[in-house]
Amino acid sequence: PMIRSKNYNFSYSGLKTAVLYAVNKLKAVNSDNKLTDEQKIMMAYEFEQAAVEVLIKKSAKAITKFKPKTLIIAGGVAANQELGRQAREMIKKDFPEVRLLISTRELSTDNATMIAVAAYLHLQNKTRIPKNFKADGNLSL
């Protein structure tokens, strides 16, 4: 799992796969082959806790090594209230000398805004995409 990796990278593909398997297992034991509302809530809660735990532990590790004056949480993830709560708790308890900045919900946009701006700039520059263009999730802007 990413939480035990020695680097500072985040990846949730393993977590998402684990959730998929857990959901399928739960659905198999339910008579209607669906999750109950309680099971959905439980899965969402556990997913959020696991995702936030990785972010907090990796951030603490980075703060310990690089000694920044400020930790900034921005982008779509900054809208997550649990992440904000745990980040404030971590800074207060373990790194009181570090300033924590969390963008407001209004400014907590995700990659869609960045992609839209990039597309707009390409349009302004009259950049054309070839018709045989293939989607690539790792394509640079």
Which residues fall in each region the model found?
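Acidic, glycine-enriched active-site microenvironments
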Residues: P1-L141
